[in-house]
């Protein structure tokens, strides 16, 4: 079978500098898509709607579910939410899109560029979680079926690194709504066919003008 892995579209920023403390929602950050992200999600319809998709799966996070929604409507499929597809920092109180990380958190950006997850992440546990999620989806689609999975850069990268025997989990730059394909054989073989197809969305990948940086010392958790 074929797994079509899609990174979510561009979400909004959630940062301490964006609103007074009294106006900030409590709990983990779970941002919706930006208008640009909504357009990116619509582009997935043209990229994938003609394929024989038998199942559509998504992370529980809003940015992934919103990305999957237009494709689900075009395919006439109800997305299946898989909790183990959530990103490694799903419980963080802040979310900063990756193109703003060099300004807002240079140390985290350099760690990501080095291919490393944050020090706070149990890499082994995260790898096992996402691998189990993907293998469960594979098991549900035997033969020559195709399933689409909308998730996150860390989730997709970590599984690819495991499949390819790489020693660092964040190896591939994955753009918003970039498409990666993995072929899964009944004999257990997994073949990475393509990584980060972006022809459908190339003109929407130039980062928007960054918002003003917060005051020095007001740190935020940044995410892919």
Protein language model features and the residues they cover:
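Domain-level recognition of soluble alpha/beta enzyme cores
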Residues: 167-189
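An N-terminal RHG(E/S)-centered segment typical of histidine phosphatases
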Residues: 1-54, 69, 73-77, 94-95, ...
């Amino acid at each position: 079978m074929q797994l079509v892995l899609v990174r979510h579209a561009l979400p909004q920023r959630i940062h301490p500098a964006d609103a007074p403390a009294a106006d900030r929602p409590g709990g983990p950050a779970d941002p919706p898509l930006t208008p640009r992200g909504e357009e990116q999600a619509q582009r997935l319809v043209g990229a994938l709607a003609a394929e024989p998709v038998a199942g559509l799966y998504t992370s529980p996070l809003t940015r992934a579910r919103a990305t999957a929604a237009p494709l689900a409507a075009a395919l006439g499929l109800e997305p299946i939410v898989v909790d183990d597809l959530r990103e490694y920092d799903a419980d963080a109180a802040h979310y900063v899109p990756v193109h703003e990380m060099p300004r807002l958190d240079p140390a985290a950006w350099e760690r990501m560029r080095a291919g490393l997850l944050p020090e706070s992440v149990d890499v082994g546990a995260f790898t096992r979680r996402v691998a189990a999620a993907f293998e469960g989806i594979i098991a549900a689609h035997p033969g020559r079926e195709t399933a689409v999975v909308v998730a996150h850069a860390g989730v997709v990268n970590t599984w690819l690194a495991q499949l390819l025997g790489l020693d660092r989990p964040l190896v591939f730059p994955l753009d918003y709504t970039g498409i990666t394909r993995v072929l899964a054989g009944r004999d257990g073989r997994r073949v990475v066919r393509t990584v980060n197809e972006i022809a459908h969305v190339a003109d929407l990948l130039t980062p928007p003008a960054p918002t003003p940086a917060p005051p020095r010392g007001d740190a935020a958790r940044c995410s892919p």
